[in-house]
Amino acid sequence: MCSIADLDGIGPFSSNPQCGHLSFTLLFEEAVLAAVPLGLCVVLALLRVRQLRLQSPKARRDRLYYAKLTALFLLASVQLVQLIQWTRPSTPKTRASIAIAAVSFASTIVFIGLCHLEHIRSAKPSDLLTLYFVTCIAFDIIRTRTLWIVSGGTAVASTFTVGLVLRLLFALLESRPKTRALQRQYLRESPEARTSLINRLFFWWVNPLLWTGFKRILDPGHLFNLDRHISSSHLFHVSAQRLNDTDLSKSYAVLLLCLREYKWTFLAGVLPRLALTGFTFAQPFLVTRFLSYESNRDARDAGATGTWLIVAYAGVYIGIAISQAGYIHQTFRFITMVRGSLLTLLYHDTMNKGSSAGIDPTSAELTLVSADIEKIQMGLQTMHQAWASFVDICLATWLLERHLGLATIPSVGFSLLCVVFGGGVAVMAGSRQTLWLEAIQKRLGLTSDVINMFKSVKMTALVNISAARVLELRDKEITVSKKFRRCLVFMVSLTYLSNVFAPIIGFTTYTLAPAIHKNNILDSARAFSSLTIFALLTEGVGSFVHSAVNLMLAVSSFERYRTTLLEKHTWHESKKASRRWTLTAPPLLENTDAEQWALEVLAATADAHTPPDDKQVCIQARDTNIGWSSEKIVVQSLSLVVRKREITLVTGPTNSGKSTLLRAMLGEAWIEGPALHRHFDRAAYCDQIPWLANKTIRQNILGGSPVDEDWYETTLQACQLKPDLGRLAQGDQTVVGNEGSRLSGGQRTRVALARAVYSRLDIMLLDDITSGLDPNTTKSIVEALFGKDGLFRRAGQTVVVASNNASFLSLADQVVDLGSGSPKVTRRNVESSSPVTAHVHNQTSPKGSRIDSARGSLDEISVADFRLEEPKREPRRLDSDTSIYMYYVRTVGVVNTAVFLALCMALVFAMVFPSIWVAWWVEANARGETNQLAKYLLVYFFLGVAALIALIGGGSHLMLRMVPRSARILHRALLDAVVVAPVPFMTRNDAGETLNRFSQDLEIIDTDVPLSGFTTLFAFITCIAQAIVVCVSSPFVTAGMVPTLVLVYFIQKFYLRTSPQLRALDLEAKAPLIGHMQETLRGLATIRAFGWAEDYEERNMRLVDESQKPFYQLTCIQRWLGLVLDLVVAGIAILLAIVIVSDKNGGATSGFLGIALTSLVSFGLNLGGFIGGWTGLETALTAVARVKRFSADTAKEDLPEECQTPPTDWPQRGEIVFDDVTASYGPGTTDVLSNVSFRISPGEKIGIIGRTGSGKSSLVSTLSRTLDLISGSILIDSIPLSSLPRDTVRQALINMPQDAFVLHGSIRTNVDPRSRLTDEAITEVLTELGLWPILAPLGGLDADAVSALPAQGLKQLLCFARVLAQPGRVMVLDEATSRLDPEASAKVKQAIMRRSEGRTLLTVAHKIDELDGYDRIMVVDAGKVVAFDTPGAVQGYLSSSSPTSSPTCSSSAAALSSGAHRVAAVGVLGTEAGRA
């Protein structure tokens, strides 16, 4: 027992041995361990009470509430009893005992009030009470032990023990979540937001997710909800407000914005990171103290010292585990916030960006949401390391100076030199990464176009050429990336250069400079304490270099975001026309000058009209220039007034600016000079290229409008969609596909038109809505919408329609002609048709046309009949880890892998063996063998050189040889899978999902897999080597390692059942983001015109949230694993400490004990590296697995029997035979062609006509093998197409599909993609089509095709140039002139007739008068050939037939059979009789 007098000092330790060695005094425990935490907690509790009183109730009183209050009331009662006991004179006490007891009692009363408010007004248990009571329990255990050894203190000790039990009970109750008591809206919060501090510190809240992933396949529904603070809506509204006040012209503006906005989350990681530094730098003191303890085992206080050393080891290593997990978790929470902000801000700014004319706007945004965001995530992971490394270096320098004196200067100077070089590498790496990202951007731009225009690319046989161009861009990207990878190799070399040579320099200086060591030999305590500090010093240097490079990479990506946002803001601010999405209405003309000007314009353009007042004016322009920039003015000096409830027709030749004018009316074009004023906020807009979302037909038509079934039916009828829907298996629930690829061109146009009609907006802006429609369908739509009793007239809507179709002339109130140099406006009653009709063509159908508009239609393009399918999820446990590893090893090369592994093992040996060499050195010094100093120093130095050689060799081999090889092979595997995929397969798959494989998956494979692989392999081998060294120090530690390894095995087995699934979900959730961004960019003008911007932003936020869930929760389970493995290291450290203290005989020499203790420090650091690398590698390999599955599972369009090789000059003649052909787009779908039989003689010119959706395009699709046959056969020059590879067929034909596909590159590349023609031949065909005068000033054949020809009609002409310049015997044109004005169309027809001499020509058209000069005309209806004869015979047939009749194939044959040409089944078509 101990007297109270011995414990009434401030201590901290008692001087009486009877109280126990190294025992705290009771006064110290009361004044420091009790009073300090209590005082802080009371102050914070009062502030927290004030805060909670302002909160709304979130939970009800339940049994947990009453249990907690009961525990606190009992605790207060016990404290009151204890206070009374302390006041008794006979009770032994210190001078502070009564005061502490009184304050404790009073504080418990405060805690009762706080507990009540925390339960009722907070969704989670009280962090403050939990932290205080846990801390209090730890200190009270020490106080309880002290009270029980005080003489005469049994009563107060018993009472205090009861209080300790009650504190423990309350801490357990307070740590329980109050799920059952929470109100319903708070139950949707993330478990992290509803759980206790202890639960969050040890990541117990992720255990349910880990168990779910262990037992079953995860899907998005199994993931936790995000808490409110990291939800995208919250992040956007917070950051958007700050962005408005940010000057984006300043460097680093976006980065600083994120730091300011989320500073508290950033700072939340500072305290645990500082704690980690404290715990980490406690290790050298523990090593020194342990070695001292080992040398003085016989001391009187050795037992107590050993016990405290065990406690200290436990505290330090458990503290390292918790603090490291805490700061990294806060880092990733900050990254999640930054990620959510950037994705939502970019989309919001994209929604407000300027439209582009011809320049593809997609690639920059796609790179920003994929590659750049990944670089930012990776860079910010080391943000706390950047500043903490300086603290670590300073502390390490101070500690080294205590051990090595002035010898510290050269070693630390060398380390700082590495830091300086590291900063330079970081700057260089940032600029080189920018070049790499720009190369990725170019590749993704072309890849996106190929995927979205897949059918056109296939039909034109440009898929291999496009793929070769993509491969070329990939090779350039890899070449550019090598410069960046050299920086990475240099960075890693600098990191390990300090690690290897700093100890060598320090020990060499110390031993060779007598003035420094002063005859003090390098003993084990000094050597291994110094080695421990060197490990921490070099870790700080390596962390700084690594974090500096990563941060610079992140900064460069932040700057790309800033530049993109700045460009959009600059464009927005420079516009003169008001924008639709502004909150206020655009300004009207208010002054009398404006009114007078409007009167003048109206007087100049109308006869005897009363000028309207401002309320009747919809659009006003005066001497306005319109274009896409100040250098690209398209419409000059436009003066126009569009009045409400009128129809305005805009006409003009191709490239005259019709589409640009409509864009200007939406505020989407560049305005120069006086403004173009719009007196409306929203308009129904139909783009020239119909934009459709990848949704159902019904969803596209409804858009954001409320559901009105009657009006919906009226809209379908007016737009002639009812017959089409009747032929689709899913009707209006048919998904339209990427870019509407599951619909025909005419159907896409009519769905877009129906969307405009259904919206019932006052303003209709319609661009070329009759292209791709047959005459009868056009006539029906024009009458139903524009006629005297049409929907537009009845509703009093204002309509501006851009078209050259003569159907609108008699219905328009005014006509704007853009084809006469300067715009000319003509009112309806002015019969001045000459300036107009030059650009207008008649599309009325022949009288008595047999092509019935009311008949059921067939879908012409792709898989329109396919039922709505759920996206097929990739299996997440299909491939074993071994198979994926082996697949990746094969891509990088088995020999390359073996070389790299050997270099890694050499590196580990050269870095681990020096500690053993130092042990032998100090033991030799201890024996007095000081004459071999040169040997030890030289070997030490050469080991460092060997390590450096192995490091540089291994890093260069990995980054400059292995990674580029795998990058090429895996990209080629993806691209090859796409190239050989059938068209229906690609149209079924979402374009965003496919593109995500070329962006996100390859980004991970190029960056994460090699870096994580190197870190994992090196750390793993190092951990094994260091574990062996630790085990050598004691056989007991070896015995303890066995169950530890078994435990680690089961931990990783449990963890790896979930983490790859989460990574797969993470990758899958990014695909909709990319797809949504693509969809938005392509339909930007339409979305803004309809006023759907807010809806699309909300959808983007939902997609961001769905993407954030797996991303954030993956980082959480990674922290769980890191914490568990760090606790395993803590267990090893505690076991080692116990073994050393318990081994009375000193089982290991001081040298090997020093190695064990030093290796334990390095083992913890390397295990941390192994954890980070391994978790990164096993999740990054998910991307490799996705590539492997996609390349293996993607269907191939060529069948085994399609393997014959035709003659090199096939087809020689161009004879085409269809023999009883029936075709459909898949099993269970409607036949799109039924029993079609005909023969086309060599050199014939055949026109194919029929209403929209009749099967014309399906018929020519069978020729290009993009549509499979159910039965029958097709022969060209007597060779069945089913026996040939499909691309061989396409290359032999000359195809011109409906949708023009322009290759990225020069005009020369587009016209002559296979490099067969001379420049003169290319120029000739361009001149023939009227393109050369446009292209010559822009660079001629070297001009960029996309930017030089912005108008869709010009792109179509360029594709015609490609078609006409190609050699070949069979030419197939599918409605190719549908978007051309009559003048351009006439030029094209003339060129076709000239250049098709001697060729077989098939031309799909909507009306027979477009086919003058053709030998025969084929009429297709409902998938059947109903007529096939000379133009005169077909014209007579159509004129004599009733439009309401429903002819069959046989009846048509009977009517048209004459001589050599028959429509009925031909029989054996290869025989002479069949050809007679």
Swiss-Prot record:
It is found in: Cell membrane. SMART domains: AAA (SM00382). The keyword Signal does not apply. Glycans are attached at N244, N464, N694, N776, N805, N842, N1235. The keyword Cell membrane applies. FR901469 inhibits the activity of 1,3-beta-glucan synthase from Candida albicans and Aspergillus fumigatus. With minimal inhibitory concentrations (MICs) against Candida albicans and Aspergillus fumigatus of 0.63 ug/ml and 0.16 ug/ml, repectively, FR901469 displays greater inhibitory activity than other 1,3-beta-glucan synthase inhibitors such as, WF11899A, echinocandin B, aculeacin A, and papulacandin B. GO terms for molecular function: ABC-type transporter activity; ATP binding; ATP hydrolysis activity. Keywords: ATP-binding, Cell membrane, Glycoprotein, Membrane, Nucleotide-binding, Transmembrane, Transmembrane helix, Transport. Residues 619-845, 1216-1447 form the ABC transporter domain. InterPro entries: AAA+_ATPase, ABC1_TM_dom, ABC1_TM_sf, ABC_transporter-like_ATP-bd, ABC_transporter-like_CS, ABC_transporter_C-like, ABCC_6TM_D1, ABCC_6TM_D2. Induction: Expression is positively regulated by the cluster-specific transcription factor frbF. It comes from the Eukaryota. ATP binds at residues 652-659, 1250-1257. One of its GO terms (cellular component) is plasma membrane. The chain crosses the membrane at residues 26-46, 64-84, 97-117, 122-142, 146-166, 266-286, 302-322, 380-400, 409-429, 487-507, 533-553, 898-918, 936-956, 1017-1037, 1121-1141, 1151-1171. It is a multi-pass membrane protein. It holds the Pfam family ABC_tran. Residues 274-553, 898-1179 form the ABC transmembrane type-1 domain. ABC-type transporter; part of the gene cluster that mediates the biosynthesis of the antifungal antibiotic FR901469, an inhibitor of beta-1,3-glucansynthase, exerting antifungal activity against the pathogenes Candida albicans and Aspergillus fumigatus. FR901469 is a cyclic depsipeptide containing 12 amino acid residues and a fatty acid chain. Probably involved in the secretion of FR901469. Belongs to the ABC transporter superfamily. ABCC family. Conjugate transporter (TC 3.A.1.208) subfamily. This is ABC-type transporter frbG. The gene is frbG.
